[in-house]
């Protein structure tokens, strides 16, 4: 998925924006100007770092510009303001995360357990590779427009998980109401998100030590539901 947020790789902030052609610095050395796309990636990387550290309300365009090595005016050439910059990081990051999950599930064997494990593994990979973006995605903000965007993105993720559950033959055989499937999607998404947040707070824990317990927690319960198990009265 090609977006300016992808991998959030920083580009050298000492270079000036341009078309990629060589220029001379004050020592006469030849160096290459950054393209507009490269400069935008530099701004996004710096913004993600500042937002992750300061939060949306505490971040300032001046600080982002300084971190990116650009002027405030250059940021406004790419984004209307702080809200659009923040929303861009959140929306692109959420979309990339969900795309990875769905692609991994689709590429796995038809077995539902393997699909779930592949999807969860892809999600944890995203969080590990893009911790700054994930921290921004998970922040609480006071801006109503950002909150509305956050709610919409969360619902899209939950609905995508619910659609995968609904396509499972054993789940379909249980004749669940759509609302019940939707609720399962909410719970699975919530468990994955909480596990990812815990992992970021405990980075010394090996990825396999996160994936294993979370997978067991999700699958053992889900498998019983798929088989029609009921709690005794």
What do the predicted segments below correspond to?
Residues 39-48, 64, 85, 89-101, ...:
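Generic hydrophobic, amphipathic alpha-helix propensity
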Residues 95-99, 125, 145-171, 182-187, ...:
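Amphipathic alpha-helical packing segments from all-alpha helical-bundle domains
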Residues 89-117, 138, 161-169:
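Amphipathic alpha-helical linker/stalk segments
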């Amino acid at each position: 998925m090609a977006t300016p947020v992808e991998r959030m790789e920083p580009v050298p902030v000492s270079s000036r924006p341009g078309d990629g052609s060589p220029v001379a610095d004050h020592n006469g050395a030849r160096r290459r100007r950054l393209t507009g796309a490269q400069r935008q990636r530099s701004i996004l990387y710096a913004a993600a770092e500042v937002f992750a550290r300061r939060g949306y309300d505490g971040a300032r365009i001046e600080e982002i510009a300084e971190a990116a090595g650009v002027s405030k005016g250059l940021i406004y050439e790419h984004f209307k303001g702080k809200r659009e910059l923040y929303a861009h990081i959140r929306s692109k990051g959420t979309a990339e995360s969900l795309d990875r999950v769905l692609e991994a599930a689709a590429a796995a064997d038809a077995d539902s357990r393997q699909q779930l494990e592949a999807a969860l593994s892809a999600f944890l990979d995203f969080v590990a590779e893009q911790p700054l973006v994930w921290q921004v995605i998970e922040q609480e903000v006071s801006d109503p427009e950002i909150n509305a965007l956050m709610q919409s993105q969360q619902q899209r993720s939950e609905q995508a998980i619910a659609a995968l559950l609904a396509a499972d033959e054993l789940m379909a055989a249980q004749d669940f109401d759509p609302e019940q499937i939707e609720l399962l999607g909410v719970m699975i998404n919530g468990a994955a998100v909480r596990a990812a947040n815990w992992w970021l707070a405990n980075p010394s824990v090996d990825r396999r030590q996160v994936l294993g317990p979370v997978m067991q927690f999700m699958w053992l319960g889900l498998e019983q539901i798929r088989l029609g198990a009921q709690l005794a009265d």
